């Protein structure tokens, strides 16, 4: 089964095809002759789930065989079913039912990735490394890979950007100490030293993503714009106020004169001020 044919199939049929092709070759293989998939994208296994699976196997047996390929005479590598293998191993069973397939490295890597993606059990770092592995092994573009695994090209590109982070940060994502969004925010920092330092601050202060982004903006010197009220030119405002004051005074003087009082009103304008003089006689 060439790699191109494998990637040309609908994901939901890939594992079924493997089982159908090998249904006549189910064998009971010794546990000590089987080793894990070298292309297994998942590096962290939930022990509680494996223990739960082991309890089911203890009662009902292994219902679905694992899939392996023969690497050397009587030595087999797991293609699919490592959780079942680990559960059986914990039960100290000597043999496990298996389907033997003849697949090359590219096909094995593709199956391992697709199987885990379908179950949504990979961490963002595991997923990113699996994409990189497939791209490195086969002359396939991100766009073609995206179509085959049912993801957008941008989703694959964004996942792979996480691999630019220092190993310490990647480990934190892998172990679920920080979220993928935390990790993405760290990509804005210029140096690995800054990224590792902020990782420590996240752990110490239990920052959420928004708090982390605010701290990163502070480091980068990005200041939040402050909204300011629009003000008219100061000179224009002062001129308007002076005119109002002058008109008010003149209107008052006019009212006094209209009431029969004889008074003198003079005004003088200088560079710095207006001078108003009002003379009111004490006697008529």
From Swiss-Prot:
Feature: DNA-binding region: 143-162
Single GO MF descriptor: DNA binding
UniProt GO cellular component terms: chromosome; cytoplasm; nucleoid
Keyword Nucleus in annotation: no
Any one GO biological process: chromosome segregation
Family of this protein: Belongs to the ParB family.
NCBIfam families named in the record: nucleoid_noc (TIGR04285), parB_part (TIGR00180)
Reported function: Effects nucleoid occlusion by binding relatively nonspecifically to DNA and preventing the assembly of the division machinery in the vicinity of the nucleoid, especially under conditions that disturb the cell cycle. It helps to coordinate cell division and chromosome segregation by preventing the formation of the Z ring through the nucleoid, which would cause chromosome breakage.
Protein's name according to its UniProt entry: Nucleoid occlusion protein
Species: Listeria monocytogenes serotype 4b (strain CLIP80459)
């Amino acid at each position: 089964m060439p790699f191109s044919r494998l990637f040309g199939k609908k994901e939901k049929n890939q594992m079924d095809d493997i089982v159908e092709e090998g249904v006549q070759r189910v064998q009971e293989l010794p546990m000590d002759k089987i080793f894990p998939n070298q292309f297994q994208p998942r590096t962290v296994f939930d022990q509680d789930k494996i223990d739960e699976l082991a309890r089911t196997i203890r009662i009902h047996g292994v219902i679905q065989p694992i899939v392996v390929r023969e690497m050397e005479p009587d030595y087999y590598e797991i293609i699919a079913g490592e959780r079942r293998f680990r559960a059986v191993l914990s039960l100290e069973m000597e043999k496990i039912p298996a389907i033997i397939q003849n697949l090359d490295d590219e096909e094995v890597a593709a199956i391992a990735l697709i199987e885990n993606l379908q179950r949504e059990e990979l961490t963002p770092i595991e997923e990113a490394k699996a994409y990189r592995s497939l791209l490195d092994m086969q002359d396939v573009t991100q766009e073609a890979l995206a179509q085959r695994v049912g993801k957008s090209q941008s989703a694959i590109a964004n996942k792979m950007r996480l691999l630019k982070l220092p190993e310490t940060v990647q480990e934190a994502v892998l172990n679920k100490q920080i979220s993928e969004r935390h990790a993405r925010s760290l990509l804005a920092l210029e140096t690995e030293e800054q990224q590792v330092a902020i990782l420590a601050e996240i752990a110490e202060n239990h920052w959420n993503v928004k708090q982390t982004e605010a701290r990163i903006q502070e480091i980068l010197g990005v200041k939040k714009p402050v909204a300011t009220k629009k003000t008219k030119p100061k000179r224009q405002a002062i001129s308007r106020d002076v005119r109002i004051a002058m008109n008010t005074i003149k209107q008052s003087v006019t009212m006094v004169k209209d009431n029969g009082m004889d008074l003198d009103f003079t005004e003088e304008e200088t560079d710095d001020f207006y001078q108003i003089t009002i003379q009111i006689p004490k006697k008529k």
